[in-house]
Design a protein with these regions (language model features):
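Intrinsically disordered, low-complexity terminal regions
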Residues: 1-230
């Protein structure tokens, strides 16, 4: 069963919807979905906020101008996109892609794989992370990887003009590359610099623990900080 709802000039709100496909689309207005489920859920607005709360299914939420807010999502994948606005997620387990051209990307209560990007704004994330790509062209990138996080693939955190900060669980092993063009390095974990490694005030390449997958922390202009938490 497919449930499509469309508005050219007005808000859309729906709840308690159950269908294979759920589609809410507004050309100029907010789009809100709550307490609903579907195999695939698409929420789109050209000019307005998009929100989903207590929703189950593969989610695509997109607005050209407005915020995207998602709370308590249950599904395998989520793609959240804003042209001009914030992207906020609280509560999700799966594969996440969240991006905005101008605004903040903030994720918490998360478990899984995430790719986060803001062209002009900050990136924040907290959760149990397996794979991570986080970037801001002009803003800070700050990630707290909670206990239970693993490196199933390389992690990369980067900023063009801003600070980069990563907190990882104590005891996590990885290869480290940390570098800044104009700023300082603050690495609060023991790093072994083997033959072929590198260390100076703006670049550090080495091994943490037993090594393994790579964590890369880079900024063109800003500070880089790496620390641990219980």
């Amino acid at each position: 069963k497919r449930v499509p709802l469309h508005s050219s000039y007005g808000d859309l709100a729906a709840q308690h919807v159950e269908a294979d496909e759920v589609q809410l689309d507004s050309s100029s207005g907010t789009v809100r979905l709550a307490d609903s489920s579907g195999k695939r859920i698409e929420l789109r607005s050209s000019y307005g906020d998009v929100s989903a709360r207590h929703v189950a299914g593969e989610l695509v939420a997109k607005t050209s101008s407005g915020d995207v807010k998602v709370e308590d999502l249950r599904g395998a994948t989520a793609t959240l996109t804003s042209g001009y606005g914030d992207v906020l997620l609280d509560g999700f387990q799966g594969d996440l892609s969240a991006s905005t051209s101008s605004g903040t990307v903030a994720v918490k209560g998360f478990t899984g794989t995430c790719e986060l990007k803001s062209s002009y704004g900050d990136v924040r994330a907290e959760g149990r992370i397996d794979r991570l790509q986080a970037r801001s062209n002009s803003g800070s990138v700050r990630v707290r990887a909670l206990s239970g996080s693993t490196l199933e693939g390389d992690w990369k955190l980067a900023s063009g003009y801003g600070d980069v900060e990563l907190m990882v669980p104590a005891g996590l092993s990885f290869e480290l590359v940390a570098k800044t063009g104009y700023g300082s390095l603050d690495v609060q974990v023991p790093v072994t610099v083997p033959a072929g490694g590198f260390k100076n005030e703006r670049k550090l390449e080495g091994r943490v623990g037993d090594g393994g997958k790579r964590i890369e922390l880079t900024t063109s202009s800003g500070n880089v900080r790496l620390g641990t938490q219980p």
